[in-house]
Every structure is written in structure tokens, then in C-alpha cells.
Amino acid sequence: MEPSQCVEELEDDVFQPEDGEPVTQPGSLLSADLFAQSLLDCPLSRLQLFPLTHCCGPGLRPTSQEDKATQTLSPASPSQGVMLPCGVTEEPQRLFYGNAGYRLPLPASFPAVLPIGEQPPEGQWQHQAEVQIARKLQCIADQFHRLHVQQHQQNQNRVWWQILLFLHNLALNGEENRNGAGPR
């Protein structure tokens, strides 16, 4: 299978509209075509070290749309349901609030929608490649952070199990410990 076919067959639930969300037009900045890249668009497309996950939502979106896959509720509302990734038991400390995490500055000359069939100037291809690289780097950072948090929680769980096992053995073998059962 050629790499271009792999990229075309890549499906991700990030780019699928949810119920009630507006569907974007094929030429708009929010369409999935912006994220699908051929080998000519970006030479780094062969180097997909990490698969796209639902942490990698589109970075360019109106403020009316929200990325439900990466939302966490603020610490001020613990009584409501907390949306956390699988395996995470503690709510992470938020680095960004609102849309600050996925707003990217665009130059004033950047058109909102290109006419169908028209190629953007060379400088805009570079800008698009930079935006895509930034998104992939953000994905890698999110995955690293998620793995770090999971590893930290697993280490904490191991410590608690070791303490529990020690107390269990101490309670069951208390008589032997008190009588001074010598070295074996």
C-alpha cells in the first residue's frame, strides 16, 4: 500500500461532525481537506510517529464551536460530572481557559475561503505546513502528558498496594513477628 493511500484512508472522529454541529463546506478552512495532506503538500507526512487521536482537534474554528473531546470542567464545579480521559482519575490542572489552547494567529492576508480549484500562493502553503506541524507537535505533547499522568497514577497505586500488602502480612503474621522468629 502506498503512503498516499494510507493518508487517504486515515479516518479520525475529530473531523466527523457531531449531531447539531454545522457541517463545513469542502473549500472552507474547517473542512477535513485542510488536514488531509498528500506527499507533495508536506514531506513530513510519511513520518507519522503518533496516530491522530481525539486530542488533536482542528486548531482553526469559530468560537461558537467547542471541542468536546478535550474539554475538562473547571475545578470550581466538582458537583457536576467531570469529563476525563480513560484511565485518568484526577482532574488535570488547566493550562489554557476557553479557546486559548487552539487559537492560532492568522495573517490578515490569509483568505478565509479559497475559490474551488485555486491554489494558494507559496507562502500560504508554508504557513499551512507550519500550522499542521504545530498541531502534530501539540498532539505529541498531549499524548506525552497523558502518558506521564497515567504512569504517575500507576506508580501511586503500586505504592498503596505495597503498603496494604505489608499491613496485611503484619496483621496475619503478628504472632511470629512478636515471638521473634529468627532468620530463615
Swiss-Prot record:
It comes from the Eukaryota. Isoform 1 is mainly expressed in B-lymphoid cells. Isoform 2 and isoform 3 are mainly expressed in B-CLL and normal B-cells. Transmembrane segments: none annotated. GO terms for cellular component: cytosol; mitochondrial outer membrane; myosin complex; plasma membrane. InterPro entries: BMF. GO terms for biological process: anoikis; cellular response to UV; negative regulation of autophagy; positive regulation of apoptotic process; positive regulation of protein-containing complex assembly; positive regulation of release of cytochrome c from mitochondria. Keywords: Apoptosis. A motif (BH3) lies at residues 133-147. Residues 67-75 are annotated as: Interaction with DLC2. Belongs to the Bcl-2 family. May play a role in apoptosis. Isoform 1 seems to be the main initiator. Interacts with MCL1, BCL2, BCL2L1/BCL-Xl, BCL2A1 and BCL2L2/BCL-w. Interacts with the myosin V actin motor complex through its binding to DLC2. This is Bcl-2-modifying factor. The gene is BMF.
